[in-house]
């Protein structure tokens, strides 16, 4: 049975809350995510910015899609984009569209200001 738009939005809200500010263990990620690309992305970002946060400013749902507008916050503690750890706190705006299937995130499309993040790391 597929989720309603409201239920899909609630699922993404729970996902963001569960993963933000703590270690993203495989068990935790697998609970919410069936998209292998997103799971790999989470692992890569977690390695560079342990316990990073995704803060949703807006969540909009329609059908099986949920759009999130918000911000990434983290502390640079591992290599990222060829940059050695700096210990700097960084933030950058982002937008993600999630497709929900079988009560999990099945696909995602990420729009992220990587230039803003790299600029903060190089200052």
Q: How does the language model describe each region?
A:
Residues 1-123:
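C-terminal and inter-domain tail/linker signature
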């Amino acid at each position: 049975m597929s989720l309603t738009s409201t239920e899909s939005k609630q699922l993404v809200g729970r996902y963001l809350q569960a993963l933000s500010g703590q270690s993203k263990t495989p068990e935790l990620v697998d609970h919410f995510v069936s998209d292998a690309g997103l799971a790999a992305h989470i692992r890569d970002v977690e390695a560079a910015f342990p316990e990073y946060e995704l803060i949703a400013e807006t969540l909009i749902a329609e059908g099986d899609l949920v759009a999130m507008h918000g911000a990434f916050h983290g502390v640079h503690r591992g290599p990222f984009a060829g940059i050695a750890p700096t210990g700097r706190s960084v933030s950058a705006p982002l937008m993600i569209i999630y497709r929900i299937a079988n009560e999990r995130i099945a696909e995602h499309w990420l729009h992220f200001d990587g230039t803003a993040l790299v600029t903060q790391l190089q200052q």
